[in-house]
């Protein structure tokens, strides 16, 4: 099933404009869709007690690029209580470029919003001052409208840049406006800047490539072991499917 034919492209799914922008822009860079095993590419299921069963839909979509992108994938979830867009670009390690990470989650009473160029090396070894200044300026503009959430723990913060957007919003009309306007604008600015940098980057030497491979593996292994979405996914799809999805699709190249 094509992602354009799913519920995730319809206006009633919370993150549809973000997903459309992702897919359209990656296609402009001649990215090729990657075949995802059918058990993960689209799934309809139910969750909850026998008396109050609820439907849930999951779609996993991905692309690659012959030189620049090892794997870029989106995981989309739609249900009465949860709506999720999780997106990650894993760049080719011949370029010294961070990950691009998005985690937009709608819970029963709150929105959790994360957007960042996530480092695979120490900040000073992967971001020049010009890039950091651009990111921090974009972040500060976004957070002039969206509240900044609490400080991340040291263990988690090492996988985020100084330009990370991190916010929590209550489920109310004002938040809908902020998501459709300020967050969407920031999302487009971040993705456009990221793809520009990725596709203009020069190849690095073998020693740095080895560091990048190790750095990417450290992040992916950490996420496989500590993915904060694991409890939610398990409640919606069961533990066995969740573990398989996390280990075989979400955090692998």
UniProtKB/Swiss-Prot annotation:
Belongs to the HY2 family. It holds the Pfam family Fe_bilin_red. Keywords: Oxidoreductase. It is an enzyme of class 1 (oxidoreductase). InterPro entries: Ferredoxin-dep_bilin_Rdtase, Phycoerythrobilin_Fdx_Rdtase. Its EC number is 1.3.7.3. One of its GO terms (biological process) is phytochromobilin biosynthetic process. Transmembrane segments: none annotated. NCBIfam families: PRK13248.1. The lineage of its organism: Bacteria, Bacillati, Cyanobacteriota, Cyanophyceae, Synechococcales. Catalyzes the two-electron reduction of the C2 and C3(1) diene system of 15,16-dihydrobiliverdin. GO terms for molecular function: cobalt ion binding; phycoerythrobilin:ferredoxin oxidoreductase activity. It catalyses: (3Z)-phycoerythrobilin + oxidized 2[4Fe-4S]-[ferredoxin] = 15,16-dihydrobiliverdin + reduced 2[4Fe-4S]-[ferredoxin] + 2 H(+). This is Phycoerythrobilin:ferredoxin oxidoreductase.
């Amino acid at each position: 099933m094509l992602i354009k034919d799913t519920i995730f492209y319809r206006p009633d799914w919370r993150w549809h404009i973000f997903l459309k922008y992702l897919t359209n822009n990656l296609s402009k860079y001649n990215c090729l869709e990657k075949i995802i095993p059918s058990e993960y590419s689209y799934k309809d299921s139910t969750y909850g007690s026998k008396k109050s069963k609820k439907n849930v839909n999951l779609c996993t979509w991905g692309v690659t690029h012959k030189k620049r992108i090892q794997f870029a994938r989106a995981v989309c979830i739609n249900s009465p209580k949860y709506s999720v867009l999780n997106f990650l670009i894993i760049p080719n390690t011949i370029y010294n470029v961070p990950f691009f990470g998005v985690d937009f989650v709608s819970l029963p009473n709150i929105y959790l919003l994360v957007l960042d160029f996530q480092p695979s090396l120490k900040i000073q070894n992967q971001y020049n001052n010009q890039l950091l200044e651009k990111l921090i300026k974009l972040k500060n503009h976004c957070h002039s409208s969206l509240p900044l959430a609490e400080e991340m723990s040291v263990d988690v913060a090492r996988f985020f840049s100084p330009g990370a957007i991190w916010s929590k919003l209550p489920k109310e009309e004002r938040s809908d406006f902020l998501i459709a306007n300020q967050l969407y604008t920031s999302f487009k600015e971040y993705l456009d800047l990221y793809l520009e940098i990725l596709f203009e980057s020069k190849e690095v030497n073998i020693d740095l490539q080895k560091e990048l491979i190790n750095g990417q593996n450290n992040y992916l292994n950490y996420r496989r072991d500590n993915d904060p979405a694991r409890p939610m996914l398990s409640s919606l799809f069961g533990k066995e499917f969740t573990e398989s999805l996390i280990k075989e699709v979400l955090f692998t190249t």
